[in-house]
């Protein structure tokens, strides 16, 4: 069995306690690994990463995993006892079967993949599997083909219409993105967005989507009377540099002469909770340019009703979990209370995940401003959306 291990957040130890203590801790960890039961070979691989080859003859995987977990806890306890740091933990990647017919380079690569994945696990331990490797290959595929895909315009805008609760017609749409691969396969966002977020590339995609959406707004303004409001998503990465984001966005809005009355930007409830100060700062700037901001996924597990009276959002988008399954009497009461508070604080209400006539009728009766969901429309491509808008709402300028 091959183990590859690293120290969680080791850079913080160096920054706070200094490189000398950091090196002392690494030497200590290395000695403890050399004393690991049935160890054949152990050593420092690079930086704060260690490797160890363990003889697990006659041991099943579960027993080995328990042994690793026990050893990691023991090392952590000893480090905390011998050094003045307050937190210490390790990530461990496991390659269990060294008898498989793979060369050393591949085995090390697979173990390293498991180590990186271990950072996402609560216990900090992950074993290599074929499924894990396939996920890693898909991740690499996304990263290596992303820039080329942008240049080739493989990312397509999709639109999910929103229906007015009063007029029962399309008044706006949420802009979504799909990736049409070179082989024609269309990827949903969950195939590539998490990877782009993790690697800091989602900002490029966001601004690609914004520009494509603004170009569409210009085109439809020239072809039809009236305007369709578009909702665009803001990724959490932009909260790291509010000034740069808003400056770039406002320049793009000015370039295409976009009437900001027809723009809404959505920020998820979870992003707001994690970046409250930055989000409020962004909202203040957006409001100066008459741009509305919507809280997306409200009620997905973070906010309380009390927070609604204090937030500066113009619109609140109720999470579809409120409408999952049938609307119970208790569910109706909760939604009524939320609607009542939102109306009193002057916020617009959008409900997503509307999938039944029962839900639609109830929401309209309670004064929901806009409804979105499969009962009305699934996300549709640009051409189909244009046809829907043309038939449902738009009047040609020649009339």
Annotated model-derived regions:
Residues 1, 44-55, 80-116, 121-129, ...:
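A short glycine-enriched loop-to-beta-strand structural element that forms part of the catalytic core
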Residues 1-2, 8-34, 43-47, 51, ...:
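Conserved long alpha-helical elements within nucleotide-processing catalytic cores of c-di-GMP signaling
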Residues 30-34, 63-82, 209-219:
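Alpha-helical scaffold within the catalytic cores of cyclic-nucleotide enzymes
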Residues 98, 104, 113-158, 196-200, ...:
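C-di-GMP signaling machinery
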Residues 138-195, 233, 295, 351, ...:
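Active-site core of bacterial EAL-family cyclic-dinucleotide phosphodiesterase domains
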Residues 165-174, 199-279, 353:
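Catalytic core of bacterial c-di-GMP phosphodiesterases, primarily the EAL and HD-GYP domains
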């Amino acid at each position: 069995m091959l183990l590859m291990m690293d120290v969680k957040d080791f850079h913080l130890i160096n920054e706070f306690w200094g490189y000398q203590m950091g090196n002392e801790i690494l030497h200590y960890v290395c000695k403890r690994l050399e004393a690991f039961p049935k160890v054949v070979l152990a050593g420092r691989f690079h930086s704060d990463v260690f490797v160890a080859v363990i003889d697990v003859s006659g041991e099943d995987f579960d027993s080995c995993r328990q042994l690793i977990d026990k050893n990691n806890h023991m090392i952590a306890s000893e480090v905390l006892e011998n050094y003045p740091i307050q937190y210490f933990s390790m990530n461990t990647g496991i390659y269990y079967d060294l008898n498989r017919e793979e060369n050393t380079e591949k085995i090390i690569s697979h173990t390293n993949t498991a180590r990186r994945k271990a950072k996402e696990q609560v216990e900090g331990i992950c074993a290599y599997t074929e499924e894990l490797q396939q996920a890693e290959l898909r991740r690499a595929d996304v990263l290596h083909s992303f820039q080329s895909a942008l240049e080739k315009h493989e990312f397509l805008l999709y639109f999910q219409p929103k229906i007015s609760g009063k007029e029962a017609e399309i008044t706006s749409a949420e802009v979504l993105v799909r990736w049409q691969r070179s082989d024609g396969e269309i990827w949903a966002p969950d195939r590539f967005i998490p990877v782009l977020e993790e690697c800091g590339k989602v900002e490029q995609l966001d601004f690609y989507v914004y520009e494509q959406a603004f170009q569409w707004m210009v085109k439809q303004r020239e072809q039809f009377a009236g305007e369709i409001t578009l909702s665009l998503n803001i990724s959490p990465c932009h909260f790291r540099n509010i000034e740069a984001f808003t400056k770039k966005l406002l320049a793009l809005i000015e370039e295409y002469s976009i009437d900001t009355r027809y723009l809404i930007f959505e920020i998820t409830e979870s992003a707001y909770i994690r970046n409250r100060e930055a989000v409020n700062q962004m909202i203040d700037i957006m409001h100066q340019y008459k741009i509305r901001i919507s809280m997306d996924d409200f009620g997905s597990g973070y906010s309380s009703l009390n927070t609604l009276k204090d937030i500066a959002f113009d619109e609140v988008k109720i999470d579809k979990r409120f409408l999952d399954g049938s609307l119970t009497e208790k569910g109706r009461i909760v939604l009524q209370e939320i609607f009542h508070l939102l109306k009193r604080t002057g916020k617009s209400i959008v409900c997503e995940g509307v999938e039944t006539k029962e839900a639609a009728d109830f929401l309209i009766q309670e004064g929901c401003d806009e409804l979105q969901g499969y009962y009305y429309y699934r996300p549709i491509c640009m051409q189909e959306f244009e046809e829907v808008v043309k038939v449902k709402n738009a009047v040609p300028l020649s009339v």
